[in-house]
Amino acid sequence: MLSWDIAVSRAINNAVPRVYKVLNEHPYIPELAKRLRGAKLEVLNNLEKYVEETIQSVKNNGGNAYYVHDAKEAQEIVGKIVGKEKIVVMGKSMVAYELGIRKYLESLENEVWETDLGEFLIQQANEPPSHIIAPAIHMTKERVGKLLKEKIGGVDENSKVEDMVAVVRKFLREKFIKADVGITGANAIAADTGSILLVENEGNIRFTTVSPPIHIAIAGVEKILPTLADAMIEPLVQSAYAGLYPPTYVNLTSGPSSTADIEHNRVRPAHGPREFHLILVDNGRVKANKDEVLREALLCIRCGRCHFHCPVYRAIGNVWGDPPYSGPMGAMWSYVVDGDSKPAMYCVHSGNCKEVCPMQINIPRVLEYIKNKGIHNDSGGFNA
């Protein structure tokens, strides 16, 4: 059996039953998902308004906010903030990968480290991610052990998983302490408060957002929600449908660190970052939002559930889609951000993805639409 078959079979056997268990034990989750879909549609229907509100809210909190049209603009802003010859730690961020942020910073002679375990592994292996929640899902335990033995030592293919995690934790702890800049994505952004929410299980994002003196968050405009109350729902729904409920950590950031312990007068900074920067990204999203069919892709919350129920993804893995976007949702997003219709051609329309999507996205319909545009030689995409 091929390495991919072994790895994905193990992952599916672990993940799929867990999601059904979570939904059975916490019956309020589907209702939260419906509310989240409604809140996301409200933003998409009034996108310009909510982008402007978010930017102003971030500024009100003492942070800096930017709106960028494409990867080049994003790279330029991040490059100016970071500078050269710095140590940068990154939390898992698909939009940062989409924009080529890590490679760009490395070209400026910065030392850049992925801190999510899966992202760290594929960085060391110089491979693309194979799943939006578990980027190193294509690696078996044995292969991970061999890779870590080669790169940092202390374990091998016969080591326990716990020991492999321990050596990476020890290696990255020094990077967190010395880091000049932390870069993350955002699972959700509250327009009314300028707050970002990040859900995780490892604790690396907490280090990334608190330890370095500068925190940069990069997120697509589709991550905006009307209120903080709406935004708080997203980590619950996303983690539940990923089979990782309850999430170990939910991080909320509203600007640079602050204190009000002297006369209840809030001043910044305190112990955490002295600077907070939010970069809101278009890169094809705004144009897709104007398309009645393609705007459905913008509702995706990146839970990765569609991957495990898709026969095509189970068969061929991360070769389906343009990294970091793989699987059924990745076939949609490859077109939104890259104008690439080829991934949609792999879809066999089993319909499983539609049945399990918490946002009720009709993924087969979207992919059929993209197929038709590809057949008619529409290569303009949505980032033209």
Give the residues covered by each predicted segment:
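Phosphate-binding glycine-rich loops and their immediate beta-loop-alpha structural context
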Residues: C300
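The feature marks the mature, well-folded catalytic cores of soluble enzymes
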Residues: M1-V293
